[in-house]
């Protein structure tokens, strides 16, 4: 239906005709002149890739921290973080919009990316994956003098490429399918 609709005029599409028409070039020219689809696509891709990279970095480090570090109240904080998944995004939109407005972030990429970066599901996902990683290797690296960033980026991330790939696919799809929040915080066509 989409392919035949792209080749027909709008009158033919609304009549329910399912045959290929001769208006593909004209329809594409009208689409490009009215919406600049290529620029919109590049802008969406840029925001989605930045979001994916930063959210994977933040959520993987949080999951690693929740699993491998010992501190008082860690489980309570983790539980509260997981409970935040029960709050629907529609209930969070107004407070997030007010915060973005007070921070003068409206009509910017930051307003689209920042409020939803820390995804509880990805933190849970990475924590579960890091449970299978041997703590003895981390302790051996600390004894050898490696700092925490070296341990995380060179020792821990290397064997968990499939976990990071799955998390990146999830984050990419979540942001790519996010239509409502950008519609709210970006109020201009520029």
PLM region descriptions:
Residues 1-190:
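A structural signal for multi-pass alpha-helical bundles of membrane permease subunits
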């Amino acid at each position: 239906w989409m392919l035949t609709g792209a080749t027909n005029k709008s009158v033919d599409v609304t009549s329910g005709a399912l045959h290929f028409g001769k208006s593909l070039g004209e329809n594409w020219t009208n689409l490009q002149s009215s919406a600049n689809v290529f620029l919109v696509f590049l802008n969406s891709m840029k925001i989605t890739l930045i979001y994916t990279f930063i959210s994977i970095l933040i959520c993987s480090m949080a999951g690693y921290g929740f699993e491998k570090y010992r501190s008082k109240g860690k489980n309570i904080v983790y539980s509260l973080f997981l409970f935040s998944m029960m709050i629907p995004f529609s209930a969070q939109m107004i407070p997030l919009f007010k915060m973005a407005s007070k921070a003068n972030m409206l009509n910017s990429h930051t307003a689209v990316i920042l409020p939803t970066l820390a995804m509880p599901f990805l933190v849970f996902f990475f924590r579960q994956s890091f449970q299978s990683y041997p703590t003895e290797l981390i302790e051996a690296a600390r004894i050898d003098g490696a700092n925490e960033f070296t341990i995380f980026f060179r020792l821990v991330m290397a064997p968990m490429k499939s976990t990071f790939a799955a998390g990146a696919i999830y984050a990419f799809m979540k942001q790519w399918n996010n239509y409502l929040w950008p519609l709210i915080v970006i109020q201009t066509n520029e």
